[in-house]
Amino acid sequence: MDLKWLQTFIAAAESESFREAAEHLYLTQPAVSQHMRKLEDELDMRLFLHSGRRVVLTDEGRLFLPYAKEMIHVYQAGKQKVSQWKQGYSRSLTLAVHPYIASYILPRFLPAYIQKHPHVELSTHVAGSDAIKQAVEHNEADIGLSRKDPNTNTLYYQHICEGTLCLAAPFQESRPDAASVLTRYRLLTHDHPSYGDAFLDNIRSHYPYLQMMAVGQTDTAVHMMKAGMGASFLPTYIIKQEEAEKKLMAVSTPAHLELPASQTFMMWKRNSEDIQHFHAMLHDFMQREQV
C-alpha cells in the first residue's frame, strides 16, 4: 500500500471534494481519482459515494478513516525519530510557555540547559495561561510554564518563583516619584497576570484622574513605554534589564498601593527523568535570578 494513497484519502475525506484534495496536495484531479481507485482495490471496499460535485464517505470509509490517520501519524513519528537521531538528539521535550516567559526568561535560561543536555531536542510554542494548561493535559506539551496557578488535580505542578513587581516608566536622568509618573503617563494595564481589577481599583482610589489603557501583553507594554506612551507595573526582572540599557526605569512605589507578587508555575503530566532535570535547573535559575 502506498502512503500517498492514504494521504489523498484523508484529504478527500476532510474536504469532501476530489478537486479540493487535489489543490491541497498539489496533484491533478485525475491523480486523486486514480489514488482512490487503487486504495479501494487494495482494501476491497468502496470508500466514497459521489453526490453532485461532492464526495461523501461510505460506512466502510468512515470506519477506515481513523486507521488511515493513525498509519500516517506512526509513519511521520518514526521518520521524525530517525531525523532526531541523525542530528544527535536522543530525546525531546515540548514546552508551552507564557509570552513573558518566552521573551524574558527562556533566552537566558535555555543556553545553560542546552549546554548541559545537548541530546534533548526542545520545541516551544507560546500560549496564554489557560491554553498552556490544556496543552499539557492533552499531551500536546510535556511542560507548561505559566504565570497563573493551574489549580488542577490532573497535573503535577509547582510554584517555582515569586518575584516582585514595580512601577516602570520611560527612562529619564532624574528619577521621578510615582505620583508624577501616574500624572504624566497613561497606565498600561492587563499586560501581566499577577494583578487584577482589585489592584487597579486600589490605584484609582489614590489617583482618581489617572488614565488607563489595556494592552494585553507584556511585550506590548514594554515597546509602548520605550516610545514614551505610558507607564506600567511590570516584573522587576524586566526593568533591571531595560534600566541597564537606559530604556526604562523603576519608580519607587508607595506602600499603600500594595504591589502583588509576580508568580511563575511549572506543570507537567508525566514524571520523566528529562522533565525532572529541566525542573531542577529552571528552579535553581529562577531562584538565582529572582525573576
UniProtKB/Swiss-Prot annotation:
Segments passing through the bilayer: none
Residue range(s) of DNA binding per entry: 18-37
A GO term, aspect molecular function: transcription cis-regulatory region binding
Domain HTH lysR-type: 1-58
A Pfam family assignment: LysR_substrate
A biological process term (GO) from this entry: regulation of DNA-templated transcription
InterPro entries referenced in this protein's UniProt entry, alphabetically: LysR_subst-bd, Tscrpt_reg_HTH_LysR, WH-like_DNA-bd_sf, WH_DNA-bd_sf
Annotated keywords: DNA-binding, Transcription, Transcription regulation
SUPFAM superfamilies noted in UniProt: Periplasmic binding protein-like II, Winged helix' DNA-binding domain
Highest taxon above the source species: Bacteria
Keyword Endoplasmic reticulum attributed: no
Keyword DNA-binding recorded: yes
Similarity field: Belongs to the LysR transcriptional regulatory family.
Name used for this protein in its record: Uncharacterized HTH-type transcriptional regulator YxjO
